[in-house]
């Protein structure tokens, strides 16, 4: 019973039956159209977002399982801002504004892939991504918001969400 895992990053609900996925699936003897349909169904809630997908294939029986990961931090932030994509020039061209609550929600949803041990550290990491893609947070530069987080300005808000972080 040989197993093979295929890891791909796809646009949620919009996988096409072409390269790079199709040749790999064909080599394993899988029905490309069927697999693409299953991936699109599994990722439909993340439409327009970049999502990691793992396909676990039993090469003997040709049975497979689709596992969907958490979308990228950039995708989650862009969606929260209602923007079409990250800024090519984040210092001069802002793509939108999000709230500190949005930042905390993204931090909690990304917990499995972050190295931060505490929510406060995760929030600072998400703020760094927000800055790099041209977002403001509560109408301020995320770098300033990081400083405010370090000074304790958001401690009450972060403490409120610690339970969600711990159980996640």
Curated annotation (Swiss-Prot):
Keyword Cell membrane: no
Residues in the signal sequence: none
GO BP terms, alphabetized: translation
Ribonucleoprotein found in the keyword field: yes
GO cellular component: large ribosomal subunit
Domain of life: Archaea
Molecular-function GO terms, alphabetical: large ribosomal subunit rRNA binding; structural constituent of ribosome
InterPro entries: Ribosomal_uL11, Ribosomal_uL11_C, Ribosomal_uL11_C_sf, Ribosomal_uL11_CS, Ribosomal_uL11_N, Ribosomal_uL11_N_sf
Keyword terms of this UniProt record: Ribonucleoprotein, Ribosomal protein, RNA-binding, rRNA-binding
Database matches in PROSITE patterns: RIBOSOMAL_L11 (PS00359)
Matching CDD domains: Ribosomal_L11
NCBIfam families linked to this entry: PRK01143.1
PANTHER family: 60S RIBOSOMAL PROTEIN L12, LARGE RIBOSOMAL SUBUNIT PROTEIN UL11M
Family, similarity comment: Belongs to the universal ribosomal protein uL11 family.
Subunit structure: Part of the ribosomal stalk of the 50S ribosomal subunit. Interacts with L10 and the large rRNA to form the base of the stalk. L10 forms an elongated spine to which L12 dimers bind in a sequential fashion forming a multimeric L10(L12)X complex.
Role, per record: Forms part of the ribosomal stalk which helps the ribosome interact with GTP-bound translation factors.
Protein name listed in UniProt: Large ribosomal subunit protein uL11
Natural source organism: Metallosphaera sedula (strain ATCC 51363 / DSM 5348 / JCM 9185 / NBRC 15509 / TH2)
Gene: rpl11
